């Protein structure tokens, strides 16, 4: 998988145009200007492929209200992934949270 810096904004927009259907989108406008390509995030800010810093007021659709780049959360998720990333609760099974 290429690193974001390995492609131009136009190249990422072209891939996006070919392979993704954006929800709640004016497709005529999207075709005219292309998608904003978000390449990284830190704290409450997003950064696009053109280097613009953008305040993420919607917290990634309210999924990252604690901010981006929180090392302690990434470490906790890593430890959990090593122990038990997922198991279903069908067939009378349970697991600790």
Label for each model-derived stretch:
Residues 2, 6-9, 53-97:
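Glycine-rich loop-to-alpha-helix module at the N-terminal edge of alpha/beta enzyme cores
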Residues 14-16, 45-49, 70-76:
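Short hydrophobic/aromatic-rich motifs at helix boundaries and adjacent loops
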